[in-house]
Each structure stands twice: as C-alpha cells, then as structure tokens.
C-alpha cells in the first residue's frame, strides 16, 4: 500500500491513489492541492508564497494528475522539474522510461543550464552487469518510444553508482553540479 500525505494533512490522507473520506484532492496548474477535515489551518509563521493562502486548501509542491477513475497519481516534485525549451519535463517519468532499457541497472535524470533551452535534460546511468554500454542515440530512442522527444536526454553520463543523500534518495543536485559546468 502506498501512502501519500504530509504533516500539513496529519499524515497519510491518500492510500493507493484514493483519498480517505473527508479528504479533497484537486490539481491546479499541475500541482496537487489538498483540502478537507485532516488539513492543518496554516503555519504559525507563514512562508511566502503561503501554501495555505486559499482557505481550506493546501497547495503542495508535488506535481500530479487525477485519472478519470478518481485515482491520484503523484508524478514528481516542482523543484525537480526541468524547464527545457519552454516545456516541463519530470525527471521521474524519464527515469521510469530509462529503467525499462535492459542495459540500465540504475539511472537519474536532472537538468543543467543551457543557453538556448534554459535547461537541458541529462541522464546518469549505471550499466547493468554484463551489458554493453548503451549509446546516447539508443537511450534517446528508447525514451521517445514512451515519452515526447523533449523528455529524451541530450547527454548521458555512465557512472559506477549514483550519488545518494543520507535517506537513500538520488542526489540530483550533486549530479547537476558535477555535470553542469
């Protein structure tokens, strides 16, 4: 079972994409917005912009979609999104596409500064044991088979392992700093 929630919602409020009774979910400009009985009234010392600015609602930093069935899908985080050529690419979706390539054991996608595009999509991959290192063209074609071409990496770096933060999540910022200069 996958739980979605945060301190502002008194913990989990959506389970396997289905909100609990009394919980409201909507998508506003791609962001997940939550409301209902479990929601905090606000912050003691509000930040700007205040995610509680709309009474009864909390604007998260998560990007999501609500399917026709009403199931919430969290697609990524606003701060991870890559703005390339005026379009938004969610690294988690590109990573999911790359992960289906048989030569990719692990991967991370991140944005680096680009004069023309704003940011360009870059991937770091760990090659599966016994596999031949895939080419950039091969990985781009693989991503384009599942996602729009703007999501395909414009460069790929092969690593022995991905850098991780203390909690085990991939450190995209470290990758962007390493390969963005």
Residue ranges and their predicted role:
Residues 1-3, 7-72, 78-81:
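Conserved AMP-binding/adenylate-forming
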Residues 3, 28, 110-112, 159:
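Conserved beta-strand termini and adjacent loop/short-helix elements that scaffold enzyme active sites
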Residues 5, 143, 168:
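Conserved S/T- and glycine-rich ATP-binding loop of Class I adenylate-forming
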Residues 7-10, 88, 163:
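Residue-level detector of flexible, active-site-proximal loop/helix-junction positions
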Residues 25, 107-109, 156:
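Generic structural signal for residues in well-ordered beta-strands
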Residues 36, 63-151, 161, 174:
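AMP-binding/adenylate-forming catalytic core of the ANL superfamily
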Residues 54, 158-159:
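Active-site donor-binding acidic/aromatic loop of nucleotide-activated sugar
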Residues 153, 159-179:
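Flexible lysine-rich "adenylation lid" loop at the C-terminal edge of ANL adenylation domains
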């Amino acid at each position: 079972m996958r739980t979605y929630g945060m301190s502002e919602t008194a913990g989990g409020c959506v389970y396997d994409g289905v909100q609990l009774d009394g919980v409201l979910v909507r998508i506003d400009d791609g962001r997940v917005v939550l409301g209902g009985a479990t929601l905090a009234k606000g912050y003691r010392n509000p930040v700007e912009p205040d995610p509680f600015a709309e009474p009864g609602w909390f604007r998260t930093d998560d990007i999501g979609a609500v399917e026709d069935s009403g199931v919430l899908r969290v697609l990524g985080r606003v701060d991870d999104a890559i703005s390339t050529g005026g379009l938004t690419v969610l690294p988690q979706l590109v990573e999911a596409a790359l992960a289906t390539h048989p030569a990719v054991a692990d991967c991370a996608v991140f944005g680096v500064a680009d004069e023309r595009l704003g940011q360009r999509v870059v991937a770091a991959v760990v090659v599966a044991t016994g596999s031949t290192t895939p080419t950039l063209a091969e990985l781009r074609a693989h991503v384009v088979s599942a996602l729009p071409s703007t999501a395909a990496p414009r460069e790929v770096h092969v690593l022995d392992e991905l850098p991780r933060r203390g909690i085990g999540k991939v450190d995209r910022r470290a990758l962007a700093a390493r390969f963005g200069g």
